[in-house]
Amino acid sequence: MKDKSIKVLEFNKIQEILKNYTCTKAAKDIIEDLKPYDSMYEVREHLEETKEAFKLLITKGAPPFEGVYDIRSGISLAEKGSALLPGQLLKIAAVLRCARRFKEYINHKEEEESYRVLENICEGIFSLPKIEEEIFNAIEGEDEIADRASSTLYNIRRSLKEKNYSVRDKINSLVRSYSSYLQENIYTVRGDRYVLPVKAEHKGAVPGLVHDQSSTGATLFIEPMSLVNLNNEIKELMLKEKAEIERILTVLSAKINANITGVKTDANIVWELDFIFAKAKFASEYNCTCPTINDEGIVDIIEGRHPLIDRREVVPISVKLGEEFTSLMITGPNTGGKTVTLKTVGLIHLMAMSGLMIPARENSVISYFNNVFADIGDEQSIEQSLSTFSSHMKNIVEIMDKADENSLVLFDELGAGTDPTEGAALAISILENLRKRGTKIIATTHYSELKAYALRKEGVENASVEFDVETLRPTYRLLIGIPGKSNAFEISKRLGLPDYIIDFARENISNENIRFEELIQNLQEKSIKAQEDARLAENLKLERDKEKKKYEEKLEGLQKVRDNALIDARREAKNIIKEAKEEADKILKDIRQLERMGYSSDARRKLEEERKKLKDKLDSIEEKEIKTVHKGEALKNVKEGDEVLLASINQKVIVLSKPDNKGDVLVQAGIMKITANIKDLRAAKGSNSNNSSSKIKKSKKLNLNLRRVESSVDLRGMDAEEAIYTVDKYLDEAYLGGLGEVTIVHGKGTGVLRKTIMDMLKGHSHVKKYRLGEYGEGGTGVTVVELK
């Protein structure tokens, strides 16, 4: 495919729009390299993946792309064996989670529609939940490791917390002792060591090590000698903490390295899915459909719209090519939409051949072409000193060298820019040469000679863009089969040019040309009328199909009601039979036990007789239960407002009309109005379901949730709505499980999720109080909740 044609048809602008629907830089890079595929098989497969993603968006909503990142730099470092930063590990885990969730998102029940192409793509996902879980368990945020990352880290931080408490107690005591020598009665920290702000003139009064001074020199920050050992211990613990964190990051990075193939594969699949769903989102936004693809040169675009024109203003066009004719000559006034038609056809083909759904109606047909050539617009080059004609001819020469039967060629104003007679002759020669090769052609022109060429040459068809002489405006509608009529005289007259000048001009045109223009006008009027009639017929057909579908759905609903009623009756009868038989068998078992103990067998024989009678009676219950649907007092007449039983569905209905001469009446069953015959109506005596159900005692069983409840819940990656639901459910379980204190992990981020959770906790019935985590607990990335 020629890059020049892709540029002229503005496919690059479609790529830029597509990028707006992606989540990752990697998917944007895929779109940047997007071009028409090299085979019809590839085109069909990529269109199918777009179509499947489009259906998933409709049926299942947004795909699970929350928190997906471009992790190529992190993968590269892990591949080299480097230790990754906490943020890099978190992003890798997020991508792994997305891949795993996508397999769940795309899964479908046996009776549901499958998604062949997307399922094949997702089959390649490794799913590494263990690594994903370890990373999320160990890392709280971009720069914070969780206490639970290792027992060693937990112990270090616990010791660190205890030492900090000790040193704070000690230094608070020193503040009180040295208060007269201090600038303020506080302590502070310099270089991870606790110090006192001592007035410079009293430095000798506080023995210790000077760590810093204020900008004015009036204050010295002195570490009292009695704190040196405690501060040293804190410093040692902090160094141990740092070393343990580095060890944890190294271990996690090594696990990524050991599974680098799976990580890379999952990441690449996620980015590919990001690209595919960007295509689907574009299709949804621009009301696109999936065309039928062929390699026979057949084109049938139904109400195609140029995607770069404002959707409120664009006028749909319908274009056919390749069956009855292989060349289409479009004529009409300037700014009438001829060039837009060419660009629409060309761009729609590039989109379809790149796996994109197209902005056209259902059942549109696109042909796979090896090449799409476009000579459109004035590309005159000042640097090359080329005229408009020369510039176009340079393009045409290149097209003539490469075009074949598998090419689509788009010419704008072919032969323009030179003497009209020579230009028209040259244009006809070029078109005829390409036509004989089997090339599919759409060309715009002003030349009458090309209109005549299309009329007399088999396989070539005229078309025109409609022009409203009354308003002096183009309608932008394309009329196939009708050459464009010159409107110069009509336009000039409406703009005020004197009649005598127009009449004199008419006298200088041959009678043959006048008759030709009149014939064109007559054909154009008839074509417009025929198209209007066709549109009206299509609308009537759509309306009829809509009504038919509505009544078919009503009929199906009634059938379901009837079937469900019969099923319920059978189920109820079976339950009665089952319970009665079980009771009888239990009594017989007891009698046999009595016999073994020496009691008379008379009771057993009598009970056997009763049991047989009961069995005979119960065996007919199911049939009787179902037959009751059709029994009841027959009705000879009904009136409006009567409540009766509709036997066919065993449901009470309200009579809405008197019987007609056929005995049909209109009745209301629930929210539906249906027609029934009076023979199918019975006198309503009350609900059978209530009576039967009252005879059956149903046992209830209390299910206790005895599973272990975790002491924390992780909300990272969730949106606000999902997080609120998860926390509410978790607090119920924790409360019932007898937990006194729990931790909610929401991460630091922008703080929106944290605020949402805190707002929810304020009025929660199980919450006694809550606070943000302290150092070592997760800081502002967690909320600690005390339960009632």
Swiss-Prot record:
Signal sequence interval, chain numbering: none
Example GO biological process: mismatch repair
PROSITE patterns found in the cross-reference section: DNA_MISMATCH_REPAIR_2, SMR
Enzyme Commission designation: 3.1.-.-, 3.6.4.-
Binding site residues for ATP: 332-339
Domain Smr: 713-788
InterPro entries reported in the protein's UniProt record: DNA_mismatch_repair_MutS_C, DNA_mismatch_repair_MutS_core, DNA_mismatch_repair_MutS_sf, MSSS, MutS, MutS2, P-loop_NTPase, Smr_dom
GO MF assignments: ATP binding; ATP hydrolysis activity; ATP-dependent DNA damage sensor activity; endonuclease activity; mismatched DNA binding; ribosomal large subunit binding; rRNA binding
Enzyme class at the top of the EC tree: hydrolase
Keyword annotations: ATP-binding, DNA-binding, Endonuclease, Hydrolase, Nuclease, Nucleotide-binding, RNA-binding, rRNA-binding
Family from the record: Belongs to the DNA mismatch repair MutS family. MutS2 subfamily.
NCBIfam families: mutS2
Entry function: Endonuclease that is involved in the suppression of homologous recombination and thus may have a key role in the control of bacterial genetic diversity.
Subunit description: Homodimer. Binds to stalled ribosomes, contacting rRNA.
Protein name: Endonuclease MutS2
